[in-house]
Amino acid sequence: MLEDKINKVMGKVAQLNGDVYHESFYNPHPYPGWCPELKHIMWGFIKELKEKEAAGVATKVDLETLSELFDVIIRSSDMLLKNNEFKQKTKVFVKAVNAFNYKLLNALSEANGNEVKNVFVSPGRLQAMLVLLSNWVDWYYKRDRILDAICCKDMNPMEVNEMFADERYLIPYVNKEKMDEGYIPTIELKTMMWYKKGLNLSKRYLIDTEKPFHVLFKALDFDSPSASDNIKHLVKNASHGLINDLQIELTNETRALLVDVLYFKATWQSLFDEDCTRTRNFYYKGGSSKVKMMSVTDVFRYYENDTFQSISLDYHSHAKTRNYSMWIHLPKQGHKIKEVLAQITEEKIGTKYKQAEVHLNLPRFELESKTSLTEVLKVLGMEGIFASDDVIPNLLKDVKIDDIVQQGRIEVNEAGTEAAMATYCVMFTGCPPHEKPKPIEMKVNHEFIFEVVEAYTGIRLFSGFVNNL
């Protein structure tokens, strides 16, 4: 009888360990981590033990079993509380990542104006790089502005670090070995920082970011003819050949280069039949072009309103639930991408999808892009990191960010999707040592104004002007 109770509790704990996200296992009040089923077993056993004590038949084994049950339930409760905390943090984190995603897309759309231009970016990787940089900037000035611009102002800075460094939050299944070819997506991530040989990095901040953020730091002679080729070769390998030629220019002013490479490959849950692919028109502002249009009829998650249609194309996975999908948002006749962006920014599209049979025509496409994000980031409130000649003093002194760029490639066909994105930040010396600027000429040889000013408050102690001497 008692062994059966222990086994029942242990079985429930094992079940909880295997499915910690199942909503029914959470009792929101008063003990969030306690499973109601475990409590029922516990109180039932206590009642039985009290009856035995009242009858004078309680044994030492009964008491030991009670103690063991308490221990099991307390430990399982602690486990559930921790996972519930992880779940709540993830919600906050995902909200920030998605908010920045649409904030960046809207800014890029505004920057394009009426220009017919494709955009391919990875907002999450840009956001992650900016979080990494925020650890090296002046915390009391630029860091808050960075976190505000990337939609993380309401989060504790230490938690921001924890979440962006922990791959479970940002990219589930990243850098995992494939369980079976063609099923679980291949997702790989590498972050590297090259700095000029002879420069000294702060050991404290190097240690604080190297392991948590999985950054490979390496000294490099940027003046060497092979330096650029070495970097391009590593990026090519990290992107599985999709980014064949990273478009960087190293000069004798280059002091550091921070590069983040994300690679993704997956097959569709519902494959497109190549025999059904036909040549069709693709219309754009001012004209049309011939494309290979794929076709499939199947049950998909789908949503539409008066402005746009939206569909979720799932990728194959070993997980019990979907882990990666491609969402397509299609403006209806008379509506533009800007209008759709405005709506999907506000709406939680993922919660609106319903199962529906859809006949889908989707163009087979390949996009290659190189996008300088410097001006867009300035618009989003990060002028400070580009204006300073000593932008990351906590790690490396006297360097200036020249540009932040994303260069990538995506291929979408009947089998699935393959994509890679390199996010890189080029840093120059704040004041090139080989180029000493000429002093500005100022000859005070005619009338002038003078002021004696208190530096902190700006209060003028004395002011005046001189007309003659």
Where in the sequence are the language-model features?
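Intrinsically disordered low-complexity regions specifically enriched for long asparagine
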Residues: 1-4, 62-65
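Surface-exposed receptor/substrate recognition regions of extracellular proteins
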Residues: 52
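Secretory/exported precursors with cleavable N-terminal leaders
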Residues: 18, 23-36, 40-44, 62, ...
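Compositionally biased, intrinsically disordered low-complexity regions
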Residues: 12, 66-67
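Short terminal alpha-helical segments
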Residues: 3-23
